[in-house]
C-alpha cells in the first residue's frame, strides 16, 4: 500500500526479482521486487546521492498511517529467513561453499573471474567450517547479539554465533553460526558462551521460516 501510494498501481506489475527505473518528485530511482527481510518487499536504489534525505522523508511520510518504522540488519525476519548480513554472517574470510551458496558458483564456465582459482582450490580441498542454524535453549533473548558468541563442543572452541534473535513467531531463540565442519551435522548438541553463561543449543535446518520464500515471491 505504501509503494502504491508513492508510485501508483503500476508498481504491482513488477515481478519477483525484476527491476524498473522510476522517478519520485524528480528523484531518480531504480526499484526492484526484492528485499532483505524474506517478506513481500521492494528495494529502492537512489541514483542521486544528494537526494537521500528527500527520499527518506517522502517514504516515511507515505508510510506514517501504516506504522512504517526504520529497521536494521538484526531484524527478526532477516534471521528467520537466514539472510546473510555482511560483517556478521559473511566477510572477506568466508566463501560460498561455507555459506551454502555454491549453487551460485559455476567453476566450469570458460569465463575467468576474480577468485576463480581460489574457489577451485577450496572446492578440491573441501571446507573446514560451515554455516549452520541453531536453536538456543534459554530464556527469550532480550535483543539481537551485538558481539560474536563462542561455541564449544566439550572443551574445544569450534565456532561462533554470528546472528541471534528471539522469534515470537516460532517461540524460540534462533541463530546463524559458523562451526567446524566435523561438528556441523543437523541435531548436533553444542554449548554457547553468552556473557560467561553456558547455554545449550542444537543444530537445526535453516531457513527457520518459509524456506521456499513463498511469502517473498508471492
Predicted regions and their residues:
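Conserved, structured C-terminal
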Residues: 1-218
Amino acid at each position: 500500500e505504501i509503494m502504491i501510494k508513492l508510485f501508483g498501481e503500476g508498481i504491482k506489475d513488477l515481478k519477483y526479482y525484476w527491476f524498473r527505473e522510476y522517478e519520485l518528485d524528480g528523484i531518480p530511482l531504480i526499484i526492484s521486487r526484492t528485499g532483505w527481510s524474506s517478506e513481500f518487499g521492494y528495494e529502492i536504489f537512489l541514483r542521486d546521492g544528494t537526494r537521500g534525505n528527500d527520499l527518506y522523508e517522502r517514504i516515511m511520510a507515505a508510510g506514517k498511517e501504516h506504522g512504517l518504522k526504520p529497521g536494521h540488519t538484526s531484524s527478526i525476519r532477516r534471521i528467520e529467513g537466514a539472510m546473510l548480513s555482511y560483517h556478521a554472517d559473511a566477510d572477506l574470510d568466508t566463501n560460498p561453499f561455507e555459506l551454502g551458496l555454491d549453487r551460485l558458483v559455476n567453476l566450469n564456465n570458460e569465463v575467468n573471474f576474480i577468485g576463480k582459482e581460489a574457489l577451485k582450490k577450496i572446492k578440491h580441498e573441501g571446507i573446514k567450517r560451515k554455516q549452520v542454524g541453531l536453536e538456543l535453549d534459554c530464556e527469550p533473548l532480550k535483543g539481537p547479539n551485538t558481539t560474536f558468541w563462542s561455541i564449544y563442543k566439550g572443551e574445544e572452541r569450534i565456532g561462533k554465533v554470528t546472528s541471534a534473535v528471539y522469534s515470537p513467531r516460532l517461540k524460540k531463540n534462533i541463530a546463524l553460526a559458523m562451526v567446524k565442519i566435523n561438528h556441523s551435522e543437523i541435531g548436533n548438541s553444542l554449548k554457547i558462551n553468552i556473557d560467561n553463561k553456558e547455554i545449550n543449543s542444537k543444530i537445526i535446518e535453516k531457513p527457520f521460516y518459509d524456506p521456499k520464500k513463498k511469502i517473498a515471491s508471492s
